[in-house]
């Protein structure tokens, strides 16, 4: 075996190996994160490998989407299909000759055999042989499972795990189309890419005995395994589309910050001393044994709360940068002034909410909420509040927060009305809704021209709604 590496390098090498059959799931992103943290903590290498042997479902578009999402999350790799490395190729579809060579070697050693199938019935085996078939019939390479053998390994998280081969059947390692099956390819790849630690979801535990049999047959040192508990939905079943969005791309479009999403994924099962943090500052604190051995539930509300905390720790310049980048996902693109962002950020938890919250400041064709119309605009005093507001704001030239507050309180006093009724009537008139940033700050930001034109517009609305 000319390519064989006889001893594992002392350098820690981990890999994230997605199948490019769709989007990057938050469960996959968390697995990538734990691998990334482990590599960085140990000054090792984080490898991206694309497992694209499912020829019917794998696409380069999905591969690119996954890489884009990982980059957006900040989980950059040291070796991979786009940047290369010393252990490539990093796509399984480009490693077929390697798989064939070592599958045939297993046959030569007596650990596997060729299964030849009926030409008209691809499931019917007509011959098993250790000689390479010269027939036109389809054939596979099948690994021979030893009888009544106990297979064991020490999981970094779960401790000793044992399996028996008593109920295991021989399994295909090389398909008739020349492509490898998962359990075989992953062993070949992890060995020749010198992977030292395999951190993956616990749904892979059932794959481990087949992989260990292959390591033993080749006489190769196996990596250390850690199987991470799964992310569940609220009903305690594995997280899926049934529970809501699961794609990293969805959360990106919904206006979540990358560091906030990574922060939340990190605390899903990792016991740390604080809930809000920058994951890049937690590298030295990462210890696999601190990961919970229990499945964890994905809480969408908690994620939104974490995101809001991150949004409020950003400088205004940083928030504006993220906000402008996020606007590529919007149909209406407006230049939102910094001052509007500044007075709005405390009331929202996502960039999308920030956009929706600030839109009335720049979109003069804003709609009035039903709440505002029913609770305030249809009331008989609304016209008096708005007409007096027009007069007083017309007389005001210096739109400071203090002056705006003074005008609004004068309206309440002169009309002998409660401040809430006056404030909410004016708030809805200038912004179309009842939940906004501070009213005094909002009018100060809008300025004289916009404030007056919006009150005038609302007065015109009253006759059309029967107020």
Curated annotation (Swiss-Prot):
Top EC class of this enzyme: ligase
Residue pairs linked by disulfide bridges in the UniProt entry: none
Subcellular location per the Swiss-Prot or TrEMBL entry: Cytoplasm
Segments carrying motif 'KMSKS' region: 238-242
Residues that, per the record, bind ATP: 241
MF term (GO), any: glutamate-tRNA ligase activity
Principal cellular location given in the protein's record: cytoplasm
Recorded catalytic activity of this chain's protein: tRNA(Glu) + L-glutamate + ATP = L-glutamyl-tRNA(Glu) + AMP + diphosphate
Enzyme Commission code(s) on record: 6.1.1.17
PANTHER family assigned to the protein according to its UniProt record, in alphabetical order: GLUTAMATE--TRNA LIGASE (PTHR43311), GLUTAMATE--TRNA LIGASE, MITOCHONDRIAL-RELATED (PTHR43311:SF2)
Quaternary structure and partners: Monomer.
Protein name according to UniProt: Glutamate--tRNA ligase 2
Gene name, Swiss-Prot/TrEMBL: gltX2
């Amino acid at each position: 075996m000319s390519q064989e590496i006889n001893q594992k390098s002392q350098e820690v090498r981990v890999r994230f190996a997605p199948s490019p059959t769709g989007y990057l799931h938050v469960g996959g992103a968390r697995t990538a994160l734990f691998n990334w943290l482990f590599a960085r903590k140990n000054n090792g290498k984080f490898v991206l490998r694309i497992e694209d042997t499912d020829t019917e479902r794998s696409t380069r578009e999905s591969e690119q989407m996954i890489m884009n999402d990982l980059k957006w999350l900040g989980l950059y790799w040291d070796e991979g299909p786009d940047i290369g490395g010393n252990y490539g190729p990093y796509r399984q579809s480009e490693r077929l000759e390697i798989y064939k060579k070592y599958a045939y070697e297993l046959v030569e050693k007596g650990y596997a055999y060729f299964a030849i199938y009926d030409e008209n019935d691809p499931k019917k085996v007509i011959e098993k042989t250790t000689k390479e078939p010269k027939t036109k019939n389809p054939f596979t390479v099948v690994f021979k499972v030893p009888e009544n053998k106990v297979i064991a390994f020490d999981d970094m998280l779960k401790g000793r795990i044992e399996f028996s081969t008593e109920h295991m059947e021989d399994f295909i390692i090389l398909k008739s189309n020349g492509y490898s099956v998962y359990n075989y390819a992953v062993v070949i790849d992890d060995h020749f890419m010198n992977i030292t630690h395999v951190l993956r979801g616990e749904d892979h535990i059932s794959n481990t005995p087949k992989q260990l049999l292959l390591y033993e047959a080749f006489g190769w040192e196996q990596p250390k395994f850690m199987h991470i508990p799964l992310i569940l939905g609220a009903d305690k079943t594995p997280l899926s589309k049934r529970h809501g969005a699961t794609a990293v791309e969805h959360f990106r479009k919904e206006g979540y910050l990358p560091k906030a999403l990574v922060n939340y994924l990190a605390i899903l099962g990792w016991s740390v001393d604080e809930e809000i943090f920058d994951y890049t500052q937690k590298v030295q604190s990462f210890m696999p044994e601190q990961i919970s051995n229990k499945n964890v539930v994905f809480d969408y509300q908690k994620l939104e709360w974490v995101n809001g905390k991150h949004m409020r720790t950003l400088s205004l310049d940083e928030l504006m940068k993220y906000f402008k980048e996020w606007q590529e996902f919007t149909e209406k693109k407006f230049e939102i002034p910094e001052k509007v962002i500044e007075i709005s950020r405390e009331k929202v938890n996502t960039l999308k909410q920030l956009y929706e919250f600030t839109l009335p400041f720049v979109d003069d064709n804003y709609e009035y909420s039903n709440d505002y119309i029913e609770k305030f605009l249809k009331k008989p005093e609304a016209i008096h509040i708005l007409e007096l507001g027009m007069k007083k704001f017309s007389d005001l030239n210096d739109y400071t927060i203090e002056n705006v507050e003074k005008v609004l309180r004068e309206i309440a006093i002169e009309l002998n009305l409660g401040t809430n009724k006056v404030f909410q009537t004016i708030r809805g008139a200038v912004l179309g809704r009842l939940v906004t940033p501070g009213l005094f700050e909002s009018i100060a930001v809008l300025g004289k021209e916009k404030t007056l034109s919006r009150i005038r517009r609302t007065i015109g609305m009253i006759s059309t709604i029967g107020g």
